[in-house]
């Protein structure tokens, strides 16, 4: 059913009446409590989502025996599936000195384990053999000929919308926006202008079932350079290995001896993992449910929603503890130390020469003295929208992202500032937009405990936000996903401030809606959040005698109608009905023909769940 509310009619009637009182609930002076009670989340929650999303990626390369080991335990996607959920909120913590001298505590870290097949280039026009095919040709039987997992990078908007549309039809589900934001951030694609989806380490897995584990591990490690990655992805990165001991069938002392030999040969970057090869079932004691990752893709969540299999997957408690201990060791002993080493080395090599007066003079000389011959002095290739691999500019972005992963936001902010000036000078628009976006994000995270920015800083942040969106949207090579993400995150930051900038947040949300970067359900959720923002202000006591002073009551009513219209366009009338009824309280004294027709049509619509194939276009 299509709504009869036209945009023209809405804006004509929105300011026509200010006499109706829309809200009847008691007022309160605690804005934060009001916002949380109305379904809005806190700045801490938003920052936590971003910290978890922009976490290190670890690619997983498994031998054939490792994948078969996991399959026998009931995990058909191979050994990667066993590791997948244990990268969430890793237990333990470590203290690290930041680049500016302050002590940082790293805890509740995240790792995103991804199958190595998902990294191989689908972005390149040239056809290269996959690493798996190379290994099968050179070492028959070393790996499975077909990848056991179909995991892929990037957001598939149709699947995200199908997932949201399916949940929206659940009458007892409240459709919280943080869940949608998290789902959008699960699909960060592999691009040259940001490196969060680039792997920081390769994890190689072999088991005690391998007849020649030492030679197999050597072959797998030596084959990593043959990965067919895009040119902008650095393959010269850290590697780790895991030797899995079968507790049920093999001798522990023999496995320990083999593992010690591996460490002597390949370095102290290995981990010994003890697991049962038997499948855990309800018949066994000391079992726990297999955890579900909080960063499942939209495709995986759709599969869970449509899955009719009621079997509960279980793990032995000892296996669960071993996998948690393994992820903790990998995170703190392997990844954090490697990132810290890279940050300190690259900061001295690439960032230090660009700081201070010397750096400014060098930048000015490059900008003005070489402007006549910019194409030969720059490492940027406009034809491919990418910098030369291993160029200083490429390392600058990687340095900033690594600092962000280490939660050294002050240092990351400085590097993003340095990099953005360089990218703007080179005409690298997407690089510049991505750096400006991260400057805004790091500024808000840094001001989490200092919510009130200076006017100068606020104006600077607003300018960065505008520049980032112009670069994302107004270039011939604009990025559909990154524009949507930038609009969404900036609007959410403004919405979540302790003293929320409701009008600014509404403007960014309106820009996101106007750009049509989201599907119909996502747009309806943004309409609803903006309405809730304006509505939350109406509960606050003010000293003004004007009943509508700083309350945004009329704007709340306007966005209430827009929310109802958006849900009706999604053909989900039971979600639209409360907003229509709420709007009638405000506009009851106005003879609004369109609204009355909408309400009458709403009463005639049967609230039923439709198949996801019937999702309307926005």
Swiss-Prot record:
Disulfide bonds: none annotated. One of its GO terms (biological process) is intracellular protein transport. It is found in: Golgi apparatus, cis-Golgi network. It comes from the Eukaryota. It holds the Pfam family TRAPPC-Trs85. One of its GO terms (cellular component) is cytosol. Keywords: ER-Golgi transport, Golgi apparatus, Meiosis, Transport. PANTHER family: TRAFFICKING PROTEIN PARTICLE COMPLEX SUBUNIT 8, TRANSPORT PROTEIN TRAPP. Component of the TRAPP I and TRAPP II complexes. TRAPP I plays a key role in the late stages of endoplasmic reticulum to Golgi traffic. TRAPP II seems to play a role in intra-Golgi transport. Has a role late in meiosis following DNA replication. Part of the multisubunit TRAPP (transport protein particle) complexes I and II. Belongs to the TRS85 family. This is Transport protein particle subunit trs85-2. It comes from Schizosaccharomyces pombe (strain 972 / ATCC 24843) (Fission yeast). The lineage of its organism: Eukaryota, Fungi, Dikarya, Ascomycota, Taphrinomycotina.
């Amino acid at each position: 059913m299509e709504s009869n509310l036209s945009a023209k009619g809405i804006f004509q009637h929105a300011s026509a009446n200010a006499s109706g009182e829309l809200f009847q609930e008691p007022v309160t002076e605690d804005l934060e409590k009001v916002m949380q009670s109305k379904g809005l989340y806190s700045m801490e929650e938003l920052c936590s989502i971003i910290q978890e999303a922009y976490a290190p990626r670890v690619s997983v390369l498994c031998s054939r025996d490792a994948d078969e080991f996991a399959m026998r335990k009931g995990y058909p996607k191979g050994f990667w599936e066993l590791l997948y959920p244990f990268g969430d909120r890793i237990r333990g913590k470590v203290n690290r000195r930041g680049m500016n001298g302050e002590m940082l505590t790293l805890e509740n870290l995240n790792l995103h384990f991804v199958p190595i097949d998902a990294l191989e280039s689908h972005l390149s026009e040239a056809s290269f053999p996959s690493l798996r095919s190379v290994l099968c040709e050179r070492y028959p039987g070393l790996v499975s000929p077909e990848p056991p997992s179909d995991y892929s990078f990037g957001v598939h908007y149709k699947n995200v919308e199908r997932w949201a549309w399916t949940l929206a039809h659940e009458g007892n589900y409240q459709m919280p926006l943080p869940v949608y934001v998290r789902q959008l951030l699960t699909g960060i694609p592999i691009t040259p202008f940001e490196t969060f989806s680039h792997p920081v380490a390769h994890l190689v897995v072999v088991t005690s079932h391998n007849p020649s584990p030492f030679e197999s591990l050597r072959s797998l490690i030596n084959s990593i350079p043959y990965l067919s990655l895009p040119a902008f992805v650095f393959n010269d990165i850290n590697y780790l290995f895991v030797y899995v001991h079968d507790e049920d069938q093999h001798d522990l002392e023999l496995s320990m001896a083999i593992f010690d030999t591996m460490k002597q040969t390949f370095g102290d970057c290995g981990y010994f993992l003890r697991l049962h090869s038997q499948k855990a079932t309800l018949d066994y004691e000391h079992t726990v449910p297999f955890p579900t990752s909080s960063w499942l893709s939209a495709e995986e969540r759709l599969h869970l929603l449509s899955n009719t299999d009621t079997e509960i997957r279980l793990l032995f408690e000892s296996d669960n503890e071993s996998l948690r201990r393994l992820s903790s060791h990998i995170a703190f002993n392997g990844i954090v130390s490697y990132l810290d080493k890279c940050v300190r080395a690259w900061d001295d090599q690439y960032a230090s020469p660009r700081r201070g007066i010397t750096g400014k003079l060098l930048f000015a000389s490059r900008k003005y003295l070489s402007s006549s011959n910019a194409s030969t002095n720059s490492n940027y290739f406009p034809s491919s929208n990418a910098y030369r691999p291993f160029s200083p500019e490429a390392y600058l972005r990687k340095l900033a992202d690594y600092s962000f992963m280490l939660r050294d936001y002050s240092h990351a902010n400085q590097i993003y500032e340095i990099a953005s000036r360089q990218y703007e000078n080179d005409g690298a628009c997407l690089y510049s937009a991505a750096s400006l976006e991260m400057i805004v994000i790091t500024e808000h995270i840094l001001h989490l405990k200092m919510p009130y920015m200076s006017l100068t800083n606020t104006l600077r942040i607003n300018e960065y936000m505008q520049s980032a969106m112009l670069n994302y949207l107004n270039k011939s090579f604009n990025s559909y996903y990154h524009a949507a993400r930038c609009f969404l995150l900036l609007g959410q930051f403004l919405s979540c401030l302790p003293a929320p900038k409701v009008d600014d947040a509404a403007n960014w949300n309106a820009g996101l809606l106007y750009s049509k970067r989201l599907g119909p359900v996502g747009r309806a959720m943004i309409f609803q959040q903006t309405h809730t923002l304006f509505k939350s202000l109406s509960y606050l006591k003010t000293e003004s005698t004007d009943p509508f002073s700083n309350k945004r009551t009329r704007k709340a009513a306007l966005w209430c109608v827009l929310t109802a219209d958006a849900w009706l366009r999604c053909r989900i009338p039971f979600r639209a009905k409360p907003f229509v009824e709420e709007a009638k309280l405000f506009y009851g004294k106005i003879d609004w023909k369109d609204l009355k027709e909408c309400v009458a049509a709403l009463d005639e619509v049967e609230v039923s769940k439709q198949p996801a194939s019937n999702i309307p276009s926005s």
